[in-house]
Amino acid sequence: MSKIVVVGANHAGTACINTMLDNFGNENEIVVFDQNSNISFLGCGMALWIGEQIDGAEGLFYSDKEKLEAKGAKVYMNSPVLSIDYDAKVVTAEVEGKEHKESYEKLIFATGSTPILPPIEGVEIVKGNREFKATLENVQFVKLYQNAEEVINKLSDKSQHLDRIAVVGGGYIGVELAEAFERLGKEVVLVDIVDTVLNGYYDKDFTQMMAKNLEDHNIRLALGQTVKAIEGDGKVERLITDKESFDVDMVILAVGFRPNTALADGKIELFRNGAFLVDKKQETSIPGVYAVGDCATVYDNARKDTSYIALASNAVRTGIVGAYNACGHELEGIGVQGSNGISIYGLHMVSTGLTLEKAKAAGYNATETGFNDLQKPEFMKHDNHEVAIKIVFDKDSREILGAQMVSHDIAISMGIHMFSLAIQEHVTIDKLALTDLFFLPHFNKPYNYITMAALTAEK
C-alpha cells in the first residue's frame, strides 16, 4: 500500500482526495494537512452570501473532515505544514501546537493561492495571521470563509455605520462584490488601475457593456487610477488614488491572487509567476511530487503553451488528474481554455480562450468576427433578448482562438462550452460556419448568431 500525503484541502485538494478515496482507496493510505478550519468553501458564492442573494453559507460547503475520514483518509485541520524534506520524504507540520512528522511515498500540493497585497501606504497584513487580516480596521481581503463572515458581521453591526465601501480591483471578484454591496444599499466605488473592468477576460467593446451596467446601478467607477494610500485613525476613513480621494468606511482589496508555493523551498522548479511548474500529469520537477489547482500551472490550448489560469473548474480537473497519477494510474490532462462567466444584475457574460488583444500579444496573426442579433425569431415576443458574440481566430491557420458572448439571456452560458471544445480540438472558423446547429423558435434562429458570425468572418 502506497502512502500519499496531500497538503491542502481546497477545491483541488478535495477533488484529488475524493478521487483517490473513491477509486483507489484500498490501494493507498491518504493523509491530509490543511491550515484552515474548514474544507471546500465555494469562494465563488461569497458575493452571493454577502449580498444576501442566498440564505446563508451552509450550501457553499460540499465536504468536510468527517466525510473524508469516513472514506478512509486521515485529515489534520488547523495544521500548517512547516517544512518538507524532499530527500527523506518527510513532511513536518504543526498539529495541535506540536511538531508532527509524516513520511510519504507520493506528495500532492493543493496549497492554492493567496491574495495579492498591493503596495498601498497604510496597509499591512497582521504578522502570523493565516486568515489575511489587515492592520487597519475595515480593510478587508476576500479569500476564505472567515473573510466573508467577518465582512458580513461588520455590515450587520449597525453601530459601525459602514455605508461607504470602496472595492479595489475590477476583476470578477471585485465586480461581483461591488454588486453585492450595492444590493445592500451601500454607496460603492469600484477602483482599478486599468481603464476598464474585467480586463483580460474580454475585449474593451465588451467590458464597456459591463461598465455601463454597473454605472446604471449606481456603482461609481474610478478606473485608470492607482491606489496610493488608505488612511484612518485606527480604522478606514479615506482611500487616496493618484487622481482623487474617496471618503469611505470600508475597503475591499480584490486585486488578484498569487500561487502559494513557499514550500518549494528552492527545490522545485517554478513558473515565471511562482507557480509550481507541472507537466500534463500534474507532476513537478521532483518525481512523485504533484501539484494541483491554483498553486500549479496549466497547459493553455489557445496559447499552445504552459500558462497560469486560476479557476475553480481547472482546480477540480487538475485534482482528478493528479489523483490518478499519484496512485499509479497514468492519466494526462488535455489542457484548458480558461472558460469563465459572470452574471451581474441579470447581464450575463461568458468567454473562453484568448481575447483579440491577448491573441495578438501571443504572436498570432489574429482578427475577429462578430454578430449582434436576437436569441430567437422576432415573432417570439417573450424572453427574447439581444445577444452579442465575438469570435477571435488566426488569419493564417483559421483556427478559433477565443470567443466572447454577452446577453440578458442566460442560454448563452452553454454556447461557450462549444467554443471551448473548438479551441481544444483546433476547429477552424470555416468549419464552424457549417456546423450542424439545430433550430427551433423556442431556442434560437435558423441563422443564429454563432453561424452568422462564422459566415461573415474575414476570408
UniProtKB/Swiss-Prot annotation:
EC number: 1.6.3.4
Molecular function via GO: oxidoreductase activity
Annotated residues for binding of FAD: 10, 12, 34-35, 44, 81, 110, 113, 143, 172, 294, 311-313, 439
Keywords, sorted A to Z: Cell wall, FAD, Flavoprotein, NAD, Oxidation, Oxidoreductase, Redox-active center, Secreted
Effects seen without this gene: Not detected on the exterior cell-wall of mutant R6 strain. Attenuates virulence in mouse BALB/c intranasal infection model. Significantly reduces number of mutant WU2 strain bacteria recovered from the nasopharynx and the lungs in a BALB/c mouse intranasal infection model.
Main subcellular location of this protein, as a coarse class: secreted
Superkingdom field: Bacteria
Uses in biotechnology: Shows antigenicity in humans and elicits protective immune response in a mouse model, thereby suggesting may be a future vaccine candidate.
SUPFAM superfamilies: FAD/NAD(P)-binding domain, FAD/NAD-linked reductases, dimerisation (C-terminal) domain
Cofactor(s) listed in the protein's UniProt record: FAD
Active-site feature positions: H11 (proton acceptor), C44 (redox-active)
Functional note: Catalyzes the four-electron reduction of molecular oxygen to water. Plays a role in redox balance maintenance. May be involved in mediating bacterial adhesion to host cells. May be considered a potential virulence factor.
Protein name: NADH oxidase
